Amino acid sequence: MFTGQRNVLLLAFSQALMLSAIVMSMALGAILGGVLAPDKSLATLPIAMMVIGTAITSLPAAILMRYFGRRAGFLIGATLGFGGSLLCAFALQQQSFALFVIGHFLLGSYQGFANYYRFAAVEATAASHASRAISWVIAGGVVAAFLGPQLGQWGRNWIDGNLFVGSYLAQAMLSLGALALLSQVKLKPIAIPRFEVPRPLREIFAQPTLQASIFGAAIGYAVMIMVMTATPLAILG
């Protein structure tokens, strides 16, 4: 037991639900994109837009949470995920590739907010337990690795005549679950230094440690996306 354990557990379960939704979209997005797209070369566009959504949202999410608090930002993110899942389900029902792409962008935005769960976990615990708190939250990915793909398979035939619409409806339920959990998180306001002078971006990006971190993260994420996107398409031929 450690200080802030309740908050950390809520964030860990929220992480598991969020990543399960993202993993499901990774597994199905390119396959269904190939079915809906007017040109098969656009099959992976939904996944690309999901990644772009995460990247574009990350900075605004940080700014929003800086002034309105972590919980408000997390609830907004989960709401975007819920809307994105419903939009994807509607897109499949209407056979609309454009709506399917937009839905995945919203799901990516959900992840952009949720990537801050681990930092909130650190803020909710004593410094001596920070590493354990981060580990618990990141461990949600282990659950997602199993739940995400199974969710897609489980819901594929929920709606007669609309293959995989049920999968995205089930995905929406994950976001609702995350909303319920996140509404119970109690975090202290983020301390904002009154006379803080921000460093120039040039100075920040000149740090070798930051450069190595960005390069490593970019390579790792690119390989992960490539494998998770291309494999389902290759299996189906």
PLM segments and residue spans:
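Helix-loop junctions at membrane interfaces in 12-TM secondary transporters
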Residues: Q5-R6, F90-I102
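C-terminal ends and interior cores of transmembrane alpha-helices
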Residues: T79-Q94
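C-terminal membrane-cytosol helix-exit motif in multi-pass small-molecule transporters
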Residues: G148, G152-Q153, A172-A191
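Short amphipathic helix-loop junctions that connect adjacent transmembrane helices
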Residues: L28-K40, T229-G237
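Cytoplasmic helix-loop-helix junction between adjacent transmembrane helices
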Residues: V101-G140
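Extracytoplasmic gate region of multi-pass secondary transporters
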Residues: L210-G237
